[in-house]
Amino acid sequence: PDVRRRAYIAKGNCDSLKDRLTEDESASVYLYTSEWEPRDQCLYVVLNSVLRSQDRRKSIPPWFLFLKLLLTALFKLRSCSMTVWRGIPLDLRKQYEIGKTYTWWGFSSCTESISVLELDQFLGQEGKRTMFSIDCFNGKKIRQHSSIESEDEILLLPGSQFVVKSYFQPSKKDPDLFIIHLKQVEPPFVLLEPPSKDIFSSEIPEGK
């Protein structure tokens, strides 16, 4: 709801060209990162819910135009090799076995700064929490186009694959926090085509 108005506002905040992106491409990143209430209606929440669903093939067609614009923007940004951090307010150790490879089908928001995750609006410092320490090679720095520049957000693309290297508890004083170390790997087949082609490869399987 209200997406057209928010898209108009996003374009108004992207009046200068950066990173060779057009105004519309920059605005797509701005709109993707925008927050509003209720949170479950934010564009990035709804879109990622579709991308991560079992029946994404049936649900994704209405998103094709926006996805092509957003992916065109992200493919123009330089891919960065770095260690990034992602936080989830759950204990996910049982879902990630050491040595196994996992595919993330949604856009994955990460940060360069671990201190950002410690803020209350993200992971906080209480309750069950999992931090992912991710050695990635195609992180996209979107700060110049984000609606919240202070977060230093790094976006990982759909279809990214990771091997679980280890997990550990960083402090006995905080038994609810665990860190899972992931290393990004190249999948055996292309799972995400450049936006000049079909957005998703026909090889994408259903589910995880």
Q: Model-predicted segments: where are they?
A:
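Internal glycine-rich, Lys/Arg-flanked active-site/core loops of soluble domains
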Residues: 2-143
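Active-site and NAD+-binding cores of ADP-ribose-processing enzymes
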Residues: 89, 101, 109-196
